[in-house]
C-alpha cells in the first residue's frame, strides 16, 4: 500500500468526526487504553504539555513547540485537524511524520486495530504517541481533541497543562 491508498483507507475505514459527525465519537477510553497497551504505553517515554481550550489551541501549541525547539529540545507536536496533508497533525521539530512511517504503521498494526473499530482520532493519537516514542522526542506538545474527560489525549500525564480561553460550553458536563 502506498501513502495515498493508506490515507484513503484511514479516511474511509475509520470513523472520522469531520465526515460523520458525532457518531465518530467513541464514548469511554476503552479503545484508547487498548491501543496504548498494545504499543507499550509510548506516551510514558517523553514529557508532555497538554493544551486545551475554546480558541487558540493550535496557535498556542505551535508557539510552545517552537519555543521548546529553539531551547534545544527535540519536540513532538500533535494537533488537529490538518489543513492540506494528514502529516501536518504529527510533527517532530517542525517536520511532518514521514509518509513511509504512516504506511508502515497502518500495514503492520491493521490486524490489531481493525477489530477495535477505533475512531480516526483514537488511531491517529496512538500513531502520534508511538512515533514520538520511536523517535525519542524530549517533549511533546499535545493538543486536546474533542475535549472532556474522555478525550483520548487525556492518557498523557502532562508536566504543565495549558488552557487557552475557555467558554462556559467547554465544560462538556465533566
Q: Where do the protein language model's features map onto the residues?
A:
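Inter-motif core of Ras-like GTPase G domains
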Residues: 158-162
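Flexible, active-site-proximal loop/turn residues at the rims of small-molecule/cofactor binding pockets
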Residues: 16, 146, 167
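Single conserved hydrophobic/aromatic residue that forms the stacking wall/gate
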Residues: 165-174
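Conserved lysine of the Walker
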Residues: 57
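Short functional linear segments
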Residues: 1-52, 60-62, 66, 70-71
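ATP-dependent carboxylate-amine ligase catalytic core
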Residues: 22-29, 33-44, 70-157
Amino acid at each position: 500500500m502506498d501513502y495515498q491508498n493508506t490515507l484513503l483507507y484511514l479516511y474511509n475505514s475509520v470513523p472520522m468526526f469531520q465526515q460523520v459527525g458525532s457518531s465518530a465519537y467513541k464514548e469511554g477510553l476503552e479503545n484508547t487504553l487498548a491501543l496504548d497497551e498494545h504499543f507499550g504505553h509510548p506516551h510514558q517515554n517523553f514529557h508532555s504539555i497538554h493544551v486545551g481550550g475554546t480558541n487558540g489551541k493550535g496557535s498556542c501549541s505551535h508557539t510552545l513547540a517552537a519555543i521548546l525547539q529553539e531551547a534545544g529540545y527535540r519536540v513532538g507536536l500533535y494537533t488537529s485537524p490538518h489543513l492540506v496533508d494528514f502529516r501536518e497533525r504529527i510533527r517532530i521539530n517542525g517536520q511532518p511524520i514521514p509518509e513511509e512511517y504512516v504506511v508502515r504503521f497502518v500495514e503492520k498494526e491493521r490486524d490489531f486495530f481493525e477489530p477495535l473499530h477505533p475512531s480516526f482520532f483514537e488511531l491517529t493519537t496512538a500513531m502520534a504517541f508511538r512515533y514520538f516514542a520511536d523517535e525519542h522526542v524530549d517533549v511533546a506538545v499535545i493538543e486536546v481533541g474533542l475535549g472532556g474527560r474522555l478525550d483520548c489525549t487525556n492518557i498523557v500525564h502532562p508536566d504543565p497543562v495549558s488552557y487557552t480561553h475557555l467558554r462556559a460550553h467547554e465544560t462538556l458536563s465533566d
